[in-house]
Amino acid sequence: MKYFISATPGPMPPTPEQFDTAIEWLEGRVDDGTFDCVYGFLEGGGFGITNADSHREALDLMAEYPLFGMVTWEVRPLLEFKEGLDTVRAKLAEAQSAMAG
């Protein structure tokens, strides 16, 4: 299962050493395939696409991040492109029929 995991810096900036440790940690997770990719935001922070077998595994991964308590997290489970489209389309058709009366 893939997850979008975003970290936004909090009000307390890390030390340069903490920052370096976090970057090394991210590089290691990209190198070992834990993250498919990692991108930064212009204003600070960034996101990655990770592979985890469960929500708990995604949480455990986040808790390992050296700046865990210094960032605000956003986590979203992802679907493969077109996965579930049949369900969405069926619900749209159902709603359209209901509106037509």
Give each language-model segment a name.
Residues 1-101:
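Conserved, structured core segments of small domains
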